[in-house]
Amino acid sequence: MNPKMILTGVSKKYTLYRNNTEKLKAMFFPKTREQHRDFYALKDINLEVYEGETIGVIGINGSGKSTISNILASVIPPTEGEMTVNGETSLIAINVGLNKNLNGYENIEQKCLMHGFSKKEIEELMPAIEEFADIGDFIDQPVKSYSSGMKSRLGFAISAHTNPDILIVDEALSVGDKTFYQKCKDKIDEFKAQNKTIVFISHNIKEIKNLSDRVLWLHNGEVREFGDKNEVIKQYEDYINWFNKLSKEEKEAHKQELKEMRSLAPSLYEEQENGKAGSGGDGTQPIVQPKRDKQAVKSAVWFFSQLVVFAVIFLTAAYFLVVPQLTDGSGSEELEQVAVGAEVQAGTSMGDIDNSDVSL
């Protein structure tokens, strides 16, 4: 089978800021980023999806499912690693790809134009898309007035009729009714019969079992398991059952541990996995806190040095802008008067010199 999507060492990293002021400061002063922690939404993902496959993606909230769907659809780029996609992708997700200020017809036209359709082709597709979405008179209304189900209907209808090579469905069926769900399932089965590749992301295990050939379990931003759907789903359900049996305090501690692990640098993460991180060598203290005092001093010195440079540039620019204005208008008249006065005085002095010469 031919691979349609290949991910090699793909990671997505975000820098966490406490507020918008710190984020803005980091944009203009990159060195201040050293004070903030990096968070891995995805880490070292290696994955191959073949032509005609339907891959189900499962995982608890925050495991990286939506991030990987956005990367596969080229909505966002990976921070690290390489990705190869052989074919045109179409992402179906709530609130993704729809302009909230445009109505249904305008969104259909916009998305079809982005997929390379001509005006004539769009006119021919419009009735089929409108019928599939089945949102009634709301097709004439701005998308911002739609419910989540309506957005999902319209998004799926557009993507299904643009005939993509790879269809990525991210929780888009979770907000629809049973009638619409069956309609979407029939369309997905039609795509499978056409040997198209589908990535299906859902919390609904029953949907994953019914639609998928293989299942990817993402956990804490990493691939926990990938393979036979029955085996992977069983392991996932065992984990969920184990987690649900924990006390409230144990659940919070487990969540905090996972959160801290995703914030580690790669080398520290490897040490954590090998049980070398922490003061006791048992991985109990995975986070190495940066020396914020020294970093703060360095950042402050660097910030004020940049401020001085900016002040010098500003004053220099102001000098060259203000001085020429002094020679215009009233300023030039004053200079002319000064010049005339100087000439008169010089003439008087010369007359005195001439008179003295005569007297001599």
UniProtKB/Swiss-Prot annotation:
Family from the record: Belongs to the ABC transporter superfamily. Teichoic acids exporter (TC 3.A.1.104.1) family.
One cellular component term from this protein's GO annotations in UniProt: plasma membrane
Cellular compartment(s): Cell membrane
ABC transporter domain segment(s): 24-245
Membrane-related topology note: Peripheral membrane protein
Keywords attached to this entry: ATP-binding, Cell membrane, Membrane, Nucleotide-binding, Translocase, Transport
Protein name: Teichoic acids export ATP-binding protein TagH
Source species of the chain: Shouchella clausii (strain KSM-K16) (Alkalihalobacillus clausii)
Protein purpose: Part of the ABC transporter complex TagGH involved in teichoic acids export. Responsible for energy coupling to the transport system.
PANTHER family according to UniProt: TEICHOIC ACIDS EXPORT ATP-BINDING PROTEIN TAGH
Region listing for Unknown, in residue ranges: 246-360
Catalytic activity from the UniProt record: ATP + H2O + teichoic acidSide 1 = ADP + phosphate + teichoic acidSide 2
Region (Disordered) residue spans: 270-290
